[in-house]
């Protein structure tokens, strides 16, 4: 199902993270780039305070190096790579404010959204000029041309996806594991679509997340930080844009969507009733407070991600 170049991309990015991370972790500790844990979070997370963060820098390094290795043969890799780096830069600034300037919430929400929309609009404007404004809708099994609505609609979806991935990054191995599965499926879809450039880029993400899991699985010795989560969110949706499959990526990334919607519902319901739907949002914290072990929550969410990917595959095969 995967061609040799995609497999090589997975292996290369995996090895880069596996080799570089043990060098970077002590350096992050030396710089005191430790995770700031909020007091209103689950009590079991308080012991994670000080765990090195910004490990997403190594994920980014692996994706960049792997992409550059294959760039000459697969030049279309450049487009999602630029989006990935741009969103990673926002995450880096956010992390820097948290861990160095000691402002636990990082960039203000408005600041973050403005930067995210600027990147999304710029990226999508350029893509529209080169690839057009048509997108595939699996529900009606046809391409539709969004025309003038392409940039605004897709920008909203891109920013939503980026922040949904960010919200998913709350448990050891959760965001990295889910993104590894999603990226693997995107690699397969890319090959079926004969888009080998996106297969390679997806493979680079698969390998980097796989390597990162070695250090991020419970009990994590490093976190990706917003550097990693915003970067991965941007990369996932950028691939979807290149494949003209934004709806499909929302299906395979269904776990991200559920996490984000749980936060939106919690906030809205609390404002209206002063009561909460969940014990805590995002949803993974709700299950923690119900007494589920952290590793159990992560594995169950991985399984649901696989099911979402199978649902997407069924939609493709049955032309739903």
Swiss-Prot record:
GO CC annotation, single: plasma membrane
GO terms (BP aspect): cell division; cell wall organization; peptidoglycan biosynthetic process; regulation of cell shape
Keyword Magnesium on entry: yes
UniProt GO MF annotations: metal ion binding; phospho-N-acetylmuramoyl-pentapeptide-transferase activity; UDP-N-acetylmuramoyl-L-alanyl-D-glutamyl-meso-2,6-diaminopimelyl-D-alanyl-D-alanine:undecaprenyl-phosphate transferase activity
Signal peptide: none
Keywords: Cell cycle, Cell division, Cell membrane, Cell shape, Cell wall biogenesis/degradation, Magnesium, Membrane, Metal-binding, Peptidoglycan synthesis, Transferase, Transmembrane, Transmembrane helix
Known EC number: 2.7.8.13
PROSITE patterns assigned to the protein according to its UniProt record, in alphabetical order: MRAY_2
Subcellular location(s) of the protein: Cell membrane
Pathway(s) per entry: Cell wall biogenesis; peptidoglycan biosynthesis
One Pfam entry name: MraY_sig1
Cofactor or coenzyme needed: Mg(2+)
Topology of this chain in the membrane: Multi-pass membrane protein
Database matches in InterPro entries: Glycosyl_transferase_4, PNAcMuramoyl-5peptid_Trfase, PNAcMuramoyl-5peptid_Trfase_CS
Transmembrane stretches, start-end: 7-27, 50-70, 77-97, 113-133, 148-168, 173-193, 198-216, 221-241, 247-267, 297-317
Catalytic activity: UDP-N-acetyl-alpha-D-muramoyl-L-alanyl-gamma-D-glutamyl-meso-2,6-diaminopimeloyl-D-alanyl-D-alanine + di-trans,octa-cis-undecaprenyl phosphate = di-trans,octa-cis-undecaprenyl diphospho-N-acetyl-alpha-D-muramoyl-L-alanyl-D-glutamyl-meso-2,6-diaminopimeloyl-D-alanyl-D-alanine + UMP
General function of this protein: Catalyzes the initial step of the lipid cycle reactions in the biosynthesis of the cell wall peptidoglycan: transfers peptidoglycan precursor phospho-MurNAc-pentapeptide from UDP-MurNAc-pentapeptide onto the lipid carrier undecaprenyl phosphate, yielding undecaprenyl-pyrophosphoryl-MurNAc-pentapeptide, known as lipid I.
Record family assignment: Belongs to the glycosyltransferase 4 family. MraY subfamily.
Family annotation (PANTHER family): PHOSPHO-N-ACETYLMURAMOYL-PENTAPEPTIDE-TRANSFERASE, PHOSPHO-N-ACETYLMURAMOYL-PENTAPEPTIDE-TRANSFERASE HOMOLOG
Protein name: Phospho-N-acetylmuramoyl-pentapeptide-transferase
Organism annotation: Caldicellulosiruptor bescii (strain ATCC BAA-1888 / DSM 6725 / KCTC 15123 / Z-1320)
Organism taxonomic ancestry: Bacteria, Bacillati, Bacillota, Bacillota incertae sedis, Caldicellulosiruptorales
Gene for this chain: mraY
């Amino acid at each position: 199902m995967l061609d040799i170049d995609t497999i090589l991309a997975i292996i290369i990015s995996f090895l880069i993270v596996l080799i570089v991370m043990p060098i970077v972790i002590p350096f992050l500790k030396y710089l005191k780039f430790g995770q700031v844990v909020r007091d209103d979070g689950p009590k079991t997370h308080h012991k994670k305070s000080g765990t090195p963060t910004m490990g997403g820098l190594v994920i980014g390094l692996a994706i960049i190096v792997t992409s550059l290795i294959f760039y000459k043969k697969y030049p279309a890799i450049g487009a999602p790579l630029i989006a990935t780096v741009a969103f990673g830069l926002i995450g880096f600034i956010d992390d820097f404010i948290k861990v160095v300037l000691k402002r636990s919430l990082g960039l203000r929400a408005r600041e973050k959204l403005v930067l995210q929309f600027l990147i999304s609009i710029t990226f999508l404007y350029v893509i529209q000029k080169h690839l057009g404004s048509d997108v595939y809708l699996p529900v009606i099994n046809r391409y539709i041309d969004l025309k003038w609505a392409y940039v605004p609609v897709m920008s909203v979806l891109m920013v939503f996806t980026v922040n949904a991935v960010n919200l998913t990054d709350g448990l050891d191995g959760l965001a990295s594991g889910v993104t590894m599965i999603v990226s693997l499926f995107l690699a397969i879809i890319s090959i079926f679509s004969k888009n080998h450039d996106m297969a390679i880029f997806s493979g680079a993400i698969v390998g980097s997340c796989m390597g990162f899991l070695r250090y991020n699985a419970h009990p994590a010795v490093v976190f990706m930080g917003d550097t990693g989560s915003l970067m991965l969110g941007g990369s996932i949706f950028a691939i979807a844009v290149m494949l003209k499959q934004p709806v499909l990526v929302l299906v395979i990334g269904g776990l991200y969507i559920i996490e984000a919607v749980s936060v939106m519902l919690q906030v809205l319901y609390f404002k209206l009733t002063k009561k909460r739907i969940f014990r805590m949002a995002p949803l993974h914290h709700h299950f923690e407070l119900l007494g589920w072990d952290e590793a159990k929550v992560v594995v169950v969410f991985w399984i649901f991600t696989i099911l979402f990917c199978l649902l997407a595959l069924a939609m493709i095969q049955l032309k739903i």
